[in-house]
């Protein structure tokens, strides 16, 4: 109401470039993208740029207001990692002519207009499901929070393909919708255990969910991995400290930050030559520990 603007905004308007880039991601993914900061800043710092980390709400009205506020600033570029990319987002970015790189795969994004760097979530899901099958598990539940159709489709695609290859059960009851948190995983696991409907194995879309499943199993006297296999996703620091140690997916988040930043600066610093938008797909790694029945040395890493 008093026309206050942060100092960096005022100063930026005094030069042709603000030396600011924004990294936009969903609030729910705050922990997931925490490691990307080092990757982005390692490249941005070399070029004298500052990275603004902008968590965006899921609720549509707040989301729209936050995005408008951010793009009203003088940005030299942005990296987009929100769970969704709507036509109105594209229109807003085009109107402001902000160079943009996508850090997720979006079906809605024009492939001929934006550079894209993303992690192959379908491959991650496929590899983990294959590992669970190789450990002798057939009924493998997939636990995730149904908040992003794009992520859900990729996650389910890999799981379903691996099960189909082995003619393993793929019924809808094995798709377990739960909040992406320890409390969410715990509540869903308790519900399944109380009802006698727990699958042989549960592959969770986050380590936090998996920790909740482990807690529920412990309270109910269910032995992991002898009676229930549990797998996570994201290789959080606690995954090697819980009991049993958690088998999970190691995602190249730091590398994602480096490549996305390099792509963005290629656009920002383009001297006028035609640059064809490119796509870089980063592959995950499987970090095998004890929670799914593995008896090999802990931390064996498979490409």
Describe the function of each predicted region.
Residues 170, 190-303:
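Flexible loop/turn connectors
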Residues 1-17:
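N-terminal helix-turn-helix DNA-binding module of bacterial transcription factors
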Residues 16-130, 134, 193-194:
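Alpha-helical recognition/docking segments in bacterial nutrient-uptake
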Residues 25-35, 53-62, 105, 116-127, ...:
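Hinge/beta->alpha junction and helix N-cap segments in small-molecule ligand-binding domains
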Residues 76, 138-140, 198-200:
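Short acidic/polar active-site loop segments enriched in Thr and Asp
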């Amino acid at each position: 109401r008093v026309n206050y603007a942060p100092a960096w905004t005022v100063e930026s308007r005094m030069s042709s470039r603000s030396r600011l880039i924004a990294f936009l991601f969903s609030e729910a993914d705050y922990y997931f993208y925490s490691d990307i900061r080092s990757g982005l800043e390692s490249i941005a710092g070399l070029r004298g740029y500052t990275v603004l980390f902008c968590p965006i709400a899921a609720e549509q009205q707040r989301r729209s207001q936050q995005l408008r506020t951010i793009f009203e600033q003088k940005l030299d570029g942005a990296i987009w990692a929100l769970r969704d990319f709507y036509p109105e987002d594209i229109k807003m970015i085009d109107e402001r002519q902000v160079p943009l790189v996508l850090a997720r795969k979006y079906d809605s994004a024009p492939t001929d207009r934006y550079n894209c760097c993303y992690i192959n979530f379908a491959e991650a899901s496929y590899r983990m499901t294959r590992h669970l099958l190789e450990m002798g598990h057939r009924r493998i539940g997939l636990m995730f929070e149904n908040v992003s159709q794009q992520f859900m489709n990729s996650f389910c695609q890999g799981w379903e393909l691996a099960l189909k290859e082995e003619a393993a059960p793929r019924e809808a009851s094995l798709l377990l919708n739960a909040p992406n948190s320890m409390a969410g995983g715990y509540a869903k696991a308790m519900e399944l255990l109380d009802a006698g409907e727990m699958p042989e194995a549960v592959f969770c879309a986050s380590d936090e969910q998996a920790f909740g499943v482990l807690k529920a199993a412990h309270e109910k006297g269910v032995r992991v991995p002898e009676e229930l296999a549990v797998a996570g996703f994201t290789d959080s620091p606690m995954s090697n400290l819980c009991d049993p140690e958690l088998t999970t997916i190691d995602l190249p988040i730091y590398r994602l930050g480096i490549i996305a930043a390099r792509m963005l600066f290629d656009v920002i610093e383009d001297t006028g030559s035609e640059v064809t938008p490119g796509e870089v797909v980063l592959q995950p790694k499987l970090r095998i520990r004890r929670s799914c029945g593995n008896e090999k040395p802990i931390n064996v890493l498979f490409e």
